[in-house]
């Protein structure tokens, strides 16, 4: 499944069966700018609120996922029957650094996002996704997206975009 939101239910009872019982052996998660990590404690509620469009169940351990590496430790401990590749969601990344602010990122905020994204790629993330029609990704200027995409390039990462407008 090249466009999955299965990460939103990872760890829930029988989550591992949803895809494999349909013959899906690989799924790529973290789509549309939504990923389960990174999460900063001060922005946990905002992250969960944003993700609630896809789930209302959140693991207790989520409050500890300051880094993508911590999230991968959690994911690796779950019962997975499908191969899983994970993108870092731009909305999740943006909330971790600047909450739900309706404005462009500052240079300092962008540098922080780039650092977190670089660490995620070093930890095994497959790429980066945006949901440019959804908040808070829609508040980003083109420069921010380009700069973040540059971070994943040396890793051979994939950039998956949900466009700004569907009209």
List where the protein language model places each region.
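Flexible loop/turn segments at secondary-structure boundaries
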Residues: 7-8, 34-38, 92-95, 135-139, ...
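Active-site core of metal-dependent hydrolases
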Residues: 125-167
């Amino acid at each position: 499944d090249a466009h999955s939101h299965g990460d939103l239910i990872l760890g829930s009872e029988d989550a591992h069966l949803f895809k494999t019982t349909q013959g899906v052996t690989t799924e790529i998660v973290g789509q549309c700018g939504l990923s389960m990590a990174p999460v900063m404690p001060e922005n946990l509620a905002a992250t969960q609120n944003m993700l609630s469009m896809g789930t209302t169940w959140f693991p207790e351990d989520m409050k500890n996922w300051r880094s993508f590496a911590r999230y991968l430790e959690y994911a690796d401990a779950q019962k997975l029957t499908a191969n899983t590749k994970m993108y870092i969601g731009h909305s999740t990344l943006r909330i971790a650094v600047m909450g739900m602010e309706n404005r462009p990122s500052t240079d300092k905020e962008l540098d922080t996002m780039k650092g977190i994204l670089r660490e995620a790629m070093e930890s095994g993330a497959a790429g980066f996704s945006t949901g440019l029609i959804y908040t808070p990704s829609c508040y980003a200027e083109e420069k921010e997206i380009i700069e973040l995409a540059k971070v994943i390039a040396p890793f051979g990462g994939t950039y998956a975009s949900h466009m700004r407008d569907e009209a």
